[in-house]
Every structure is written in structure tokens, then in C-alpha cells.
């Protein structure tokens, strides 16, 4: 489903929906890079490229809810959930002028340094 007004990450107010979506993806990626403990994978004996799929929703108030993660190890899933739950409050997505819940999925990919 296409949403009329996408959720807006802080600092991503400019441009159309596509610009805002792109800005949000970049900001979330940077946020995750800063906060995610990538050494955890090495400590767990994992090596090479790791991929964690994260699904969450941005609710009608702009808060992150319902964070779920799939990863090669349960501790990586927990870490991904921890980091996504730290995301700042956003402007909620809107449909016909009303705030709506918007699902969001995000891959977290990183390389384990040996």
C-alpha cells in the first residue's frame, strides 16, 4: 500500500515522500552503525558477512513499536531490537490527514572483522 505522507525521521522534512524515505533510510542506517555492537558477532564465533532482518512499526504518535528481528544468533536479534527501540520519535505517517501505523523493514548487514 502506498502511503500519502510517509513517516518523517528528525531532520528529514524536506522534499517529497521519496526524498523523505531515502533520508530516513540513511539516518536509520547511520544510527544503527553507531549504536549496534558489531563485536558481538565475533564474540559469538560468527565470521564473514552477517545479515539481520528487522521489522517494526511506526505508530500513530511516531514511536517505534513491535520490533522483531531475524538473525543467525538470538543475541544478535536482541541487539538489533535494542538498537531499533532507541530510534528517536518521528512524525507519524498520514493517510487522508489522519495519523496511521506504518510498517517498516530494514536489513542490518555488517562484516565481522577477524
For each predicted feature, which ranges?
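Charge-biased low-complexity segments
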Residues: 1-114
Amino acid at each position: 500500500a502506498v502511503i500519502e505522507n510517509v513517516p518523517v525521521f528528525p531532520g528529514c522534512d524536506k522534499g517529497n515522500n521519496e526524498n523523505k524515505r531515502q533520508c530516513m533510510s540513511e539516518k536509520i542506517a547511520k544510527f544503527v552503525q553507531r549504536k549496534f555492537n558489531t563485536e558481538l558477532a565475533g564474540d559469538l564465533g560468527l565470521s564473514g558477512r552477517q545479515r539481520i532482518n528487522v521489522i517494526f512499526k511506526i505508530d500513530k504518535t511516531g514511536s517505534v513499536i513491535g520490533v522483531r528481528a531475524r538473525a543467525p544468533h538470538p543475541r544478535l536479534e536482541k541487539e538489533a531490537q535494542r538498537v531499533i527501540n532507541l530510534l528517536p520519535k518521528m512524525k507519524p505517517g498520514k493517510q487522508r490527514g489522519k495519523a496511521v501505523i506504518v510498517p517498516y523493514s530494514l536489513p542490518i548487514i555488517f562484516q565481522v572483522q577477524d
